[in-house]
């Protein structure tokens, strides 16, 4: 890595010149291969129906992230009572906190396993079938979590969190890929962002349900976990009417006629020959003997650098610190002087603002003047500046300057909003734009697994580090967001509206120019 940085410092050409040179190189190569850009398509009612139905699976992910915040203390008290009734032992507060921490972390453990398996399942059984049967895990988890108090058996919560982690892990690898494979090239960003949009909606709803006025009581908290069955049943009712990915049908089943029929239905017209030919050409270029079996081939040859970039894009999302703010937002607000139910209200309010910002990203991500790269760099840069200001205002607040507490809340808001405009939605579907049909499933699985690993690491380490160095813990995120912003600027091409082959050529050219 040091060698790469050193070579970057020696590079005397400006990035803009390099980028234009790269684009010219790619365009020339595309013309030589007789590739033409696909015509822009519009939203159709059926495309919107399919995208909305598929993205319902993402609701589970966001709900499980947000639902544990408010009722956590209530569940810990119940665990202590339940343990005494089961085993006749009195748990200390530390022991009860540890059991609850294990239950919370099992979500990430399940997510790692589920995301790693998602590529195999998607390629073996198809995108649609995998998504359909994945709902079984969600329903089993909902039963375990919501009836744990009824049966007075807290290990059901631990097991339920693992099951729902498996479900969400499969979802995180499958849904962004499925969405972008159904979308036309000019709408890939909008369609891919539905994954993060549903996560944001679910986080807000779960936090609202956890308020004391609704289900945030000793009697009501099991109903929070039962609510996740609603979108699960809704998807079970709608997904059978959706279509399979045409790219999957061509690359895995060689069923061009069915792929054509699906494209005509999605696009709302019969002029799909050009798009179908692009899919066939993509398959012909990429379906070649792989010398390394399974996932190993992703880290060999032409796949190696795109896979590394995909993983680092996922790291840029999680190491930005958004998980720390999401998991511990109530605690952060309490330390800022908010009391009573005010921290919970503030957390719900922030979730609503983040949701609005995610909606804003939908309109910018495919805009000619923005695209993925600029939004991602802008988001990381905004988070970098916000994290510095959070540290400054927390320091002033601790020194007795009460006005700084209000400024701190403002900068946390800035931190969350800038995340929603780039690092939130973009990494999820970025991998699907880099890889072709033959390797997309496995690549999406590996990148999603890296996201879960990073999420687990941040959730596990932030609170202990924060207890030691206090507000200066946010300087970690300053370093990471700055580093990943530079990385995106130097090594990540714009993917908006481009084919995987064109993107990979530009990616290879950028790497060669910078590292030479």
Swiss-Prot record:
<feature type="topological domain" description="Extracellular">
    <location>
        <begin position="328"/>
        <end position="344"/>
    </location>
</feature>
<feature type="transmembrane region" description="Helical; Name=9">
    <location>
        <begin position="377"/>
        <end position="397"/>
    </location>
</feature>
<keyword id="KW-1133">Transmembrane helix</keyword>
<feature type="topological domain" description="Cytoplasmic">
    <location>
        <begin position="183"/>
        <end position="200"/>
    </location>
</feature>
<comment type="function">
    <text>Appears to have no transport activity for glucose.</text>
</comment>
<dbReference type="InterPro" id="IPR005828">
    <property type="entry name" value="MFS_sugar_transport-like"/>
</dbReference>
<dbReference type="Pfam" id="PF00083">
    <property type="entry name" value="Sugar_tr"/>
</dbReference>
<feature type="topological domain" description="Extracellular">
    <location>
        <begin position="69"/>
        <end position="101"/>
    </location>
</feature>
<feature type="topological domain" description="Cytoplasmic">
    <location>
        <begin position="366"/>
        <end position="376"/>
    </location>
</feature>
<feature type="transmembrane region" description="Helical; Name=10">
    <location>
        <begin position="410"/>
        <end position="430"/>
    </location>
</feature>
<keyword id="KW-0812">Transmembrane</keyword>
<feature type="topological domain" description="Cytoplasmic">
    <location>
        <begin position="123"/>
        <end position="138"/>
    </location>
</feature>
<dbReference type="InterPro" id="IPR036259">
    <property type="entry name" value="MFS_trans_sf"/>
</dbReference>
<feature type="transmembrane region" description="Helical; Name=3">
    <location>
        <begin position="139"/>
        <end position="159"/>
    </location>
</feature>
<dbReference type="InterPro" id="IPR020846">
    <property type="entry name" value="MFS_dom"/>
</dbReference>
<feature type="transmembrane region" description="Helical; Name=5">
    <location>
        <begin position="201"/>
        <end position="221"/>
    </location>
</feature>
<feature type="topological domain" description="Extracellular">
    <location>
        <begin position="466"/>
        <end position="471"/>
    </location>
</feature>
<feature type="transmembrane region" description="Helical; Name=7">
    <location>
        <begin position="307"/>
        <end position="327"/>
    </location>
</feature>
<feature type="transmembrane region" description="Helical; Name=8">
    <location>
        <begin position="345"/>
        <end position="365"/>
    </location>
</feature>
<dbReference type="GO" id="GO:0015749">
    <property type="term" value="P:monosaccharide transmembrane transport"/>
</dbReference>
<feature type="topological domain" description="Cytoplasmic">
    <location>
        <begin position="431"/>
        <end position="444"/>
    </location>
</feature>
<dbReference type="InterPro" id="IPR005829">
    <property type="entry name" value="Sugar_transporter_CS"/>
</dbReference>
<dbReference type="GO" id="GO:0016020">
    <property type="term" value="C:membrane"/>
</dbReference>
<feature type="transmembrane region" description="Helical; Name=2">
    <location>
        <begin position="102"/>
        <end position="122"/>
    </location>
</feature>
<dbReference type="InterPro" id="IPR045263">
    <property type="entry name" value="GLUT"/>
</dbReference>
<feature type="topological domain" description="Cytoplasmic">
    <location>
        <begin position="244"/>
        <end position="306"/>
    </location>
</feature>
<feature type="transmembrane region" description="Helical; Name=6">
    <location>
        <begin position="223"/>
        <end position="243"/>
    </location>
</feature>
<feature type="transmembrane region" description="Helical; Name=12">
    <location>
        <begin position="472"/>
        <end position="492"/>
    </location>
</feature>
<comment type="similarity">
    <text>Belongs to the major facilitator superfamily. Sugar transporter (TC 2.A.1.1) family.</text>
</comment>
<feature type="region of interest" description="Disordered">
    <location>
        <begin position="1"/>
        <end position="37"/>
    </location>
</feature>
<protein>
    <recommendedName>
        <fullName>Facilitated glucose transporter homolog</fullName>
    </recommendedName>
</protein>
<keyword id="KW-0472">Membrane</keyword>
<feature type="compositionally biased region" description="Low complexity">
    <location>
        <begin position="14"/>
        <end position="26"/>
    </location>
</feature>
<keyword id="KW-0813">Transport</keyword>
<feature type="topological domain" description="Cytoplasmic">
    <location>
        <begin position="493"/>
        <end position="516"/>
    </location>
</feature>
<feature type="topological domain" description="Extracellular">
    <location>
        <begin position="160"/>
        <end position="161"/>
    </location>
</feature>
<dbReference type="GO" id="GO:0015149">
    <property type="term" value="F:hexose transmembrane transporter activity"/>
</dbReference>
<dbReference type="GO" id="GO:0005886">
    <property type="term" value="C:plasma membrane"/>
</dbReference>
<feature type="topological domain" description="Extracellular">
    <location>
        <begin position="398"/>
        <end position="409"/>
    </location>
</feature>
<keyword id="KW-1003">Cell membrane</keyword>
<feature type="topological domain" description="Extracellular">
    <location>
        <position position="222"/>
    </location>
</feature>
<feature type="topological domain" description="Cytoplasmic">
    <location>
        <begin position="1"/>
        <end position="47"/>
    </location>
</feature>
């Amino acid at each position: 890595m040091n060698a790469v940085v050193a070579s970057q410092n020696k590079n005397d050409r400006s990035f803009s010149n390099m980028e234009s040179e790269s684009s010219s190189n790619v365009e020339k190569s595309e013309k030589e291969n007789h590739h033409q850009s696909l015509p822009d398509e519009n939203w159709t009612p059926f495309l919107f129906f399919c995208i909305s139905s598929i993205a319902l699976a993402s609701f589970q992910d966001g709900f499980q992230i947000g639902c544990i915040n408010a009722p956590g203390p209530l569940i810990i008290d119940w665990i202590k009572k339940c343990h005494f009734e089961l085993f006749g032992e009195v748990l200390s507060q530390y022991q009860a906190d540890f059991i609850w921490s294990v239950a919370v972390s099992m979500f990430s453990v399940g997510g790692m396993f589920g995301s790693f398996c998602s590529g195999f399942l998607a390629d073996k059984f198809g995108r649609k079938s995998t998504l359909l049967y994945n709902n079984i895990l969600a329903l089993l988890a909902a039963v375990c979590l919501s009836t744990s108090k009824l049966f007075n058996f807290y290990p059901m919560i631990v097991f339920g969190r693992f099951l729902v982690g498996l479900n969400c892990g499969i979802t995180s690898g499958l849904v962004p890929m499925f969405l972008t494979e159904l979308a036309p090239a000019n709408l890939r960003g909008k369609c891919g962002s539905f994954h993060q949009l549903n996560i944001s909606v679910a986080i807000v709803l779960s936090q609202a349900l956890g308020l004391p006025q609704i289900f945030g009581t000793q009697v009501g908290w099991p109903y929070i976990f039962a609510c996740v069955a609603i979108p699960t049943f809704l998807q079970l009712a709608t997904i059978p009417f959706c279509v399979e990915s045409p790219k999957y049908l061509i690359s895995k089943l060689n069923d061009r006629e069915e792929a054509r029929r699906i494209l005509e239905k999605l696009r709302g017209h019969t002029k799909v020959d050009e798009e179908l030919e692009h899919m066939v050409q993509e398959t012909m270029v990429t379906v070649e003997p792989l010398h390394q079996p399974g996932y190993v081939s992703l880290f060999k040859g032409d796949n190696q650098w795109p896979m590394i970039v995909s993983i680092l894009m996922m790291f840029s999302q999680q190491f930005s610190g958004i998980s720390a703010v999401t998991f511990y937002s109530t605690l952060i607000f309490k330390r800022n002087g908010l009391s009573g139910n005010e921290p919970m209200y503030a957390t719900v309010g922030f979730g609503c603002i983040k949701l609005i910002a995610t909606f804003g990203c939908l309109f910018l991500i495919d805009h000619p003047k923005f695209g993925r790269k600029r939004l991602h760099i802008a988001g990381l840069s905004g988070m970098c500046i916000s994290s510095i200001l959070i540290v400054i205002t927390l320091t002033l607040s601790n020194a007795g300057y009460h006005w700084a507490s209000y400024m701190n809340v403002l900068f946390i808001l800035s931190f969350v909003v800038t995340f929603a405009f780039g690092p939130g939605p973009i990494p999820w579907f970025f991998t699907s734009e880099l890889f072709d049909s033959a390797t997309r499933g496995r690549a999406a699985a590996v990148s999603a697994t890296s996201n879960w690993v990073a999420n687990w690491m941040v959730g596990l380490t932030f609170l202990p580090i924060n207890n030691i160095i206090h507000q200066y813990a946010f300087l970690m995120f300053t370093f990471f967001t700055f580093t990943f912003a530079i990385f995106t600027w130097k090594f990540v091409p714009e993917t908006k509206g481009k084919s995987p082959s064109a993107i990979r050529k530009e990616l290879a050219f950028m790497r060669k120019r910078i590292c030479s």
